[in-house]
Amino acid sequence: MQSDVISRVKKIYIKNKIDISSKIFPYYQTTDYYLTYHNMKDRLENMHECFLKQFTKHISEYSDVDCKISFYKFIIQKFKNIKKNIKNNSISDCFEISPYKKLGIIFVSDNISDYLIEYLFGGCELKNSSNGLFKKLTLSTINIVKKMFKIILEQYYFLWNKVSLCKMKLILNRLQNLNEISNVNFINSKDTFVTFLFRLRIANKFGMLGICLPTSLSFQCNNEADVNSVHNVSHISYDNVVNTEIRKRLFQVIVYNCKIVLKIVLIENYITLSKIIAFKVGDILPIHMLDNVVAYSENVPILIGKYKMFKNKYVFCVVDYYNSTLNYKNG
């Protein structure tokens, strides 16, 4: 019964997919990116494991400070949401990814960078103010933070190039906040990024490290890797199976969450036009209530029920899912 109803709703969804997909499933436009990263999941997990070890090693080379970093999650979001989420409590930089001429973003919580500089190099003048966070950065502080970002990015993208046939060369720009990145480097607020987030603890300070890649580039990288792996039949066949299964599940999510309009015909009555024209205020029209009431969506029968009174309200009492093989008799 349920499967029959689900198939009916699927037909309704497919019929109106263009009109309702954005309302029903807000992440529909990023579905392909999630599929991409599912396919790259094992490669990315191995890459991040190596990256975390290398990052910890670099920190320990500077001092004996206790450092722990772990991969938190990745999210796909527009640049305006990145700015909204991390606001101005992070030091940020943007970098160019050559030869694709795409811009990425790296940021770290200011309490982490502040502590590192203070612990390793004797302090800094990093303070929040109404004039903006970066007005208080000294030249030495900027150089130190940029060096830290450079180490992080070089190691990260060295490993990224190992898991993807899409090779990247990083060109760091100047240290700045997210508003400056938006204005100076012409990142559109609607541009979409994959943000890899890492939990970071240095001594007793906790914060976040984030690396943002443009989704278009990330998607392109995985596509290039798949195309160049055409001789690996098992790899292609596995990816095809994974893609098919995930698309089925995603489509099921879309169908289960789609909003359909139910129309319920409570009565049936037949009358001639001459009688309708002859009606006067107060005239009574006898009606014949149906024994079985059907709830329709887009003229597709979905539910069978009864018309009843419940707590002084007229209600549709569900009896069963509609089954086209049964004959529902009406009175």
UniProtKB/Swiss-Prot annotation:
Keywords: Bacterial flagellum, Cell inner membrane, Cell membrane, Chemotaxis, Flagellar rotation, Membrane
Cross-referenced Pfam families: FliM, FliMN_C
SUPFAM superfamilies: Surface presentation of antigens (SPOA)
Gene3D superfamilies to which the protein is assigned, alphabetical: CheC-like (3.40.1550.10)
GO molecular function: cytoskeletal motor activity
Membrane topology listed for this record: Peripheral membrane protein
GO biological process, one term: chemotaxis
Cellular localization per UniProt: Cell inner membrane; Bacterial flagellum basal body
Keyword Membrane applies: yes
GO CC, alphabetical: bacterial-type flagellum basal body; plasma membrane
Role this protein plays: FliM is one of three proteins (FliG, FliN, FliM) that forms the rotor-mounted switch complex (C ring), located at the base of the basal body. This complex interacts with the CheY and CheZ chemotaxis proteins, in addition to contacting components of the motor that determine the direction of flagellar rotation.
Similarity comment: family membership: Belongs to the FliM family.
Protein name as catalogued: Flagellar motor switch protein FliM
Source organism: Buchnera aphidicola subsp. Baizongia pistaciae (strain Bp)
